[in-house]
Amino acid sequence: MNHYSFSSLIRAFIPLSLVIVSAAWQPAALADTRHIIVDSGDSTLSKEAARQSKEQWDSTRSLRNKVNNRVEKEFDKTEKAIDGREKCNASYNVNAYWENTTDRCLDRRTGRPVTP
């Protein structure tokens, strides 16, 4: 009876051992088929994308410079008007007055521009 159970146990372990061996063999077989592709990134599509990105950057840079120049010009104009008003109001010339619509210091009698 003991001998019969041992042989049936062996018969059960043989297929089980084959499954274990085949499972252990599988990673080695997969490792042989794997390969690594190293790409330098210089494909035609990536070059075209880089060119388009640079072109867009250059155009937005030009636009930003135009906007910044306009803002700077407006600031300088306002600053010049404020300085002119302060000089005109501090002037010793009694007939000088500041005209807000034209941002100029004018003579009360003649209406001509005065340098304070």
UniProtKB/Swiss-Prot annotation:
Q: Which organism is it from?
A: Pectobacterium carotovorum subsp. carotovorum (strain PC1)
- Which key words tag this protein in UniProt? Signal
Q: Which family does it belong to?
A: Belongs to the UPF0482 family.
The name on file for this protein is UPF0482 protein PC1_2049
Q: Which domain of life is it from?
A: Bacteria
Could you say which residues form the signal peptide?
1-31
Could you tell me which Pfam families the record lists for this protein? Answer: DUF1283
| Matches recorded under InterPro entries | DUF1283
